[in-house]
Amino acid sequence: MSICPHIQQVFQNEKSKDGVLKTCNAARYILNHSVPKEKFLNTMKCGTCHEINSGATFMCLQCGFCGCWNHSHFLSHSKQIGHIFGINSNNGLLFCFKCEDYIGNIDLINDAILAKYWDDVCTKTMVPSMERRDGLSGLINMGSTCFMSSILQCLIHNPYFIRHSMSQIHSNNCKVRSPDKCFSCALDKIVHELYGALNTKQASSSSTSTNRQTGFIYLLTCAWKINQNLAGYSQQDAHEFWQFIINQIHQSYVLDLPNAKEVSRANNKQCECIVHTVFEGSLESSIVCPGCQNNSKTTIDPFLDLSLDIKDKKKLYECLDSFHKKEQLKDFNYHCGECNSTQDAIKQLGIHKLPSVLVLQLKRFEHLLNGSNRKLDDFIEFPTYLNMKNYCSTKEKDKHSENGKVPDIIYELIGIVSHKGTVNEGHYIAFCKISGGQWFKFNDSMVSSISQEEVLKEQAYLLFYTIRQVN
């Protein structure tokens, strides 16, 4: 944070100074008193790419445009229009895009000075007292439901899903409109309970915490009706529930369509639901002749998460290297029509299309030949920022390359599900990163802040990464 000569130049004119300070104070008031829904959809959403970048979006001081930092959309706005001052939508600080630093001028960081420039109307206007919900609420364990609540926490703290739910895309088109009968309605109910606003009467009510669990109860009811194996007190797998929940979100979308009966799973390539537009990627499997390097067969298959072997591995990058490495197909009797030879072929997997949200499963549960199962407790080191450049197929690399150079493709860690215990007796806990970069631990109904250093020490089972930049 530094003293900005550009804002000092503006302050030389008393009228301009008054305007800047009043605008800054008004913006901070809006940021501090807006319900999360409004912040997500307005002040935290980039006006160019429409991505929600909590903590990395700036509101233009001169025209109100919101632009992100990650894709340089506010910088582009600044260069094109000449507006150089932006207010960070998360912390309310003013940033100068010419100085490339936050402004440390005392008039802009001293609340006492700013208060002098607040319009008199504020002292005469009554604003209803509201308790703002920020999503930081646990989910009560209703009998071995930790596998559900851990997945739900990672989902409802995903900015893409929050934007989708708060846009009311499903509720505006749902033909059922009942959270106890529609899975997506139940999810929307949970989001409303965790991010919506309470009035004074509701905030003081003793039933408030119970009311916040209504959506979760509805979701349990729907899930048990759809799949009875999810009911009861037996140990369940969080990864299987992740696959179940995204399938139900897709099915709800299909049912909302006017021609729902004509839509089938075969049409997923054209599906515009959040599952297939945000979470779906595709894998390219190639069979290559080791003699002449002829690529004789290539198949493209979709994926919603990647399962990685962790045995004898220490780092996530080692797991990805193993997933991507070339494999010799022994006893395959592969005949190459190009060089007219028969030999063992080479098979390799590469990512044909990367999703916006990349979900990775670390395969901790192993099925043994004697029919029993065991858990692999190996610690796998995983990064906060993951570079997926080396694991893409040639086509995906070419799509991002400039002048023949393949750029880094960076994903940011935003969620973790860890498993404590054994195969038969265990417990799931979620860790989620919210706006401002703060991590929180969700252990059923208990929520607590946790440092990033502690998060990176966890025995991860599922990792949720979101695309951040290609550079």
UniProtKB/Swiss-Prot annotation:
Record-listed Zn(2+) 5 binding positions: H250, C271, C273, H276
Task: Write the record's keywords in alphabetical order, separated by commas.
Answer: Hydrolase, Metal-binding, Nucleus, Protease, Thiol protease, Transcription, Transcription regulation, Ubl conjugation pathway, Zinc, Zinc-finger
Q: Would I find Coiled coil among this entry's keywords?
A: no
Looking at the record, the residues that make up the USP domain are 137-468
- Show the Pfam families listed in the entry: UCH (PF00443), zf-UBP (PF02148)
What EC number(s) would the UniProt record show?
3.4.19.12
Q: Provide the residue positions that the database annotates as binding Zn(2+) 6.
A: C289, C292, C336, C339
- Active site at C146, H427
Q: Reaction catalysed?
A: Thiol-dependent hydrolysis of ester, thioester, amide, peptide and isopeptide bonds formed by the C-terminal Gly of ubiquitin (a 76-residue protein attached to proteins as an intracellular targeting signal)
Q: Which GO terms describe its cellular component?
A: DUBm complex; nucleus; SAGA complex; SLIK (SAGA-like) complex
The UniProt entry lists the main location of this chain as nucleus
Binding positions for Zn(2+) 4 per the UniProt entry: H170, C174, C182, C185
Query: Which InterPro entries has this protein been placed in?
Result: Papain-like_cys_pep_sf, Peptidase_C19_UCH, Ub_carboxyl-term_hydrolase, USP_CS, USP_dom, Znf_RING/FYVE/PHD, Znf_UBP
The terms under GO molecular function for this entry are:
cysteine-type deubiquitinase activity; molecular adaptor activity; zinc ion binding
S-S pairs: none
- Which residues are listed for Zn(2+) 3 binding in this entry? C60, C63, H77, H83
Q: Impact of mutating H419A?
A: Lowers histone H2B deubiquitination activity
Q: What is known of its domains?
A: The UBP-type zinc finger domain is required for the interaction with the SAGA complex. The USP domain is the catalytic domain, but it is only active when in complex with the other DUB module subunits.
Family, according to the entry, reads as follows: Belongs to the peptidase C19 family. UBP8 subfamily.
Q: What else is known?
A: Present with 1030 molecules/cell in log phase SD medium.
Record's function text? Histone deubiquitinating enzyme component of the transcription coactivator SAGA complex. SAGA acts as a general cofactor required for essentially all RNA polymerase II transcription. At the promoters, SAGA is required for transcription pre-initiation complex (PIC) recruitment.
Query: Subunit structure, per the record?
Result: Component of the 1.8 MDa SAGA (Spt-Ada-Gcn5 acetyltransferase) complex, which is composed of 19 subunits TRA1, SPT7, TAF5, NGG1/ADA3, SGF73, SPT20/ADA5, SPT8, TAF12, TAF6, HFI1/ADA1, UBP8, GCN5, ADA2, SPT3, SGF29, TAF10, TAF9, SGF11 and SUS1.
The name this protein carries in UniProt is Ubiquitin carboxyl-terminal hydrolase 8
Q: Which organism is it from?
A: Saccharomyces cerevisiae (strain ATCC 204508 / S288c) (Baker's yeast)
Identify the coding gene.
UBP8
